[in-house]
Swiss-Prot record:
It is found in: Cytoplasm. The lineage of its organism: Eukaryota, Fungi, Fungi incertae sedis, Microsporidia, Nosematidae. It comes from the Eukaryota. Belongs to the class-II aminoacyl-tRNA synthetase family. Gene3D superfamilies: Bira Bifunctional Protein, Domain 2, Nucleic acid-binding proteins. Its EC number is 6.1.1.22. NCBIfam families: asnS. This is Probable asparagine--tRNA ligase, cytoplasmic. It is an enzyme of class 6 (ligase). It holds the Pfam family tRNA-synt_2. SUPFAM superfamilies: Class II aaRS and biotin synthetases, Nucleic acid-binding proteins.
Length: 447
């Protein structure tokens, strides 16, 4: 250990210094002698004095050491000192620690930190493991963890059962072109695109079920809102109708946003004073059918990338989804509903009034585009077989899933929420890669 010259014995460490977690130190500890551990966040020195911030568990404390010592960012320290009133007129901290002694863990001063405020996005991602040591990036961990807990709490309050489905599968849900294929012993298998089918098997027993798990899409999409591996919040509800499904997702989204900002809003404002937090959306969300959305874009003079009009049958890209939120939704989320059968997978229930459409929806969020997709599910055996044939799938591969339409079927539906997209919206991130720990996409699979 590197010690300041006053011995531990002389300081009577055991008797005089209260060992306390840095995150628990408060103004109520004023004038107390404390021992705590943390990492140097920043440091500046004078002729015979050192000022540094020590950080741990998303909290920092100001420290004053009446000796000159060169400390670098990320150096691990145990300090012994006294809590006193902050004497700096430039700092707004309520208190500071007058350090009487410090220990440098393993006698190791950290090397020069490779990141700063001017670092590019790619450099930040390259050093993602160190970027976490910066306050804003490190706070992402707390934000993500908090939002996950909030979502779980809401499901728990709604009597949902959480399941942990497999992620190695032999069936597809969202189309074969986006599957990651692998060898599973002597058979072909895939990384899951969605856990929906497994949730459907649970719904007749649990009535309400959800999972929060990784899903994988082999899409070569080089955008700010796509990941190859993402956190998928999926739910399935038995004995419901389309309106019930819509109400459930509206409740989940609005309540998640409210609780998230109630919990972390002040901290976010302190870290990002330049951004404006999202408002909690008003319910019910505005709705527009897919065919009407096509007409709306044309009426607004919004063209496709090739400068032609949209026609029924076209996919609506995320850039135009944002326009729908801005102009039709007036800056609020919009539910786009009743997509064409050929747009959606085999399992979606047909609209009873128009069987060219499905009882489906995408939730479009301002500034992001789609963050949730959902539908009522087919519950008729013969119509499921028709769906498999339409998409060129072998029903024998889905024999277990077809049993759901034979053994006690009911009207049921569900949805999948892209967790990182929601977090991206709430934290006002400019890139979805900020919403996950170590992004996986066409550019990154390291570390």
């Amino acid at each position: 250990m590197v010690y300041e010259e006053v011995s531990l014995k002389n300081l009577k460490i055991k008797n005089d210094y209260k060992s306390i977690e840095l995150s628990e130190i408060s103004k109520s500890d004023m004038h107390k002698r404390i021992k705590t551990f943390g990492w140097v966040d920043c440091c500046r020195t004078g002729k015979s004095i050192t000022f540094f911030d020590l950080t741990c568990q998303f909290k920092s404390i100001k420290c004053v050491y009446e000796k000159k010592i060169d400390l670098t960012k990320c150096t691990s320290l145990t300090i012994y000192g006294t809590i006193q009133e902050n004497k700096s007129k430039k700092e707004n901290a309520e208190f500071e620690v007058l350090v009487e002694k410090l220990e440098i863990f393993n006698d190791a001063i950290a090397p020069s930190f490779p990141l700063n405020k001017e670092s590019s996005f790619d450099t930040m991602m390259k050093y993602g493991h160190l970027a976490l040591r910066n306050k804003q990036r490190g706070f992402f961990l707390k934000a993500r963890s908090s939002l996950l807990k909030i979502i779980r709490d809401i499901f728990y309050e709604g009597n949902f059962i959480e399941i942990t489905p497999p992620t190695i599968v032999q069936t597809q849900v969202e189309g074969g072109s986006t599957l990651f294929k692998l060898k599973y012993y002597d058979k072909d298998a895939y990384l899951t695109q969605s856990s929906q089918l497994y949730l459907e098997t649970v719904a007749p027993v649990a009535y309400r079920a959800y999972c929060i798990a990784s899903s994988y899409r082999a899409e070569k999409s080089n955008t700010t809102r796509h990941l190859s591996e993402y956190t998928h919040v999926e739910a399935e509800l038995a004995n419901i109708e389309f309106e019930d499904l819509i109400n459930n997702i509206e409740h989940l989204v609005t309540e998640s946003i409210k609780r998230f900002y109630d919990l972390l809003g002040d901290e976010i404002k302190d870290l990002y004073p330049e951004i404006k937090l999202q408002n909690v959306p008003k319910r019910p969300f505005k709705r527009i059918r897919y065919v009407d959305a096509i007409k709306f874009l044309n009426d607004e003079g919004v063209k496709k990338d090739d400068d032609t009009d949209f026609v029924v049958g076209d996919d609506i890209p995320d850039s135009r989804e944002k326009i729908i939120c801005e102009r039709f939704g007036k800056g609020e989320p919009v539910l786009m509903t009743h997509f064409l059968v050929e747009h959606k997978p085999f399992y979606m229930k047909l609209d009873s009034s128009n069987e060219t459409c499905t009882e489906s929806f995408d939730l479009l969020y301002p500034g992001i585009g789609e963050i949730v997709g959902g539908s009522m599910r087919l519950d008729n055996y013969n119509k499921l077989i028709d769906g498999f044939k339409r998409e060129g799938l072998n029903p024998e591969d889905y024999d277990w899933y077809l049993d759901m339409a034979r053994f006690g079927p009911c009207s049921h539906g569900g949805y999948g929420l892209g967790f990182e997209r929601l977090l991206m919206a709430l934290m006002r991130y400019t890139n979805i890669e900020f919403a996950t720990l170590y992004p996986r996409n066409t550019r990154r699979c390291h570390p």
